[in-house]
Amino acid sequence: MAESKMRIKLKGYDHAIVDQSIVKIIQAAEGTGAKVRGPIPLPTEKQVITILRAVHKYKDSREQFDMRTHKRLLEILNPTAATMDILKRVQLPSGVDIEIKL
């Protein structure tokens, strides 16, 4: 018997908010009786932006800023209709992007 699974990928700039969201999703999914595998930490994307400090000259004086995107993967095995309904109603913070694949 092939088991169905739902993959939930969360992204965010603050790892603490992403981890809190994962805990909310796990509690909601386990409340419906579904098995949860994860959270699996995925590689963190790091984007570095370099700008000149001076307006006109002094090219040797630069400043770097970085932006990190933290990602987590969660698998829910054999999700039911109740599991999907509960996951639609979970309130997540505004700094978290969620992607669900069946």
Curated annotation (Swiss-Prot):
A Pfam family annotated for this UniProt entry: Ribosomal_S10
InterPro entries documented for this protein: Ribosomal_uS10, Ribosomal_uS10_CS, Ribosomal_uS10_dom, Ribosomal_uS10_dom_sf
GO cellular component: ribonucleoprotein complex; ribosome
GO molecular function per UniProt: structural constituent of ribosome; tRNA binding
GO BP: translation
Keywords: Ribonucleoprotein, Ribosomal protein
Gene3D superfamilies: Ribosomal protein S10 domain (3.30.70.600)
HAMAP family: Ribosomal_uS10
Family stated for the protein in its record: Belongs to the universal ribosomal protein uS10 family.
Subunit comment: Part of the 30S ribosomal subunit.
Purpose: Involved in the binding of tRNA to the ribosomes.
Name of the molecule in the record: Small ribosomal subunit protein uS10
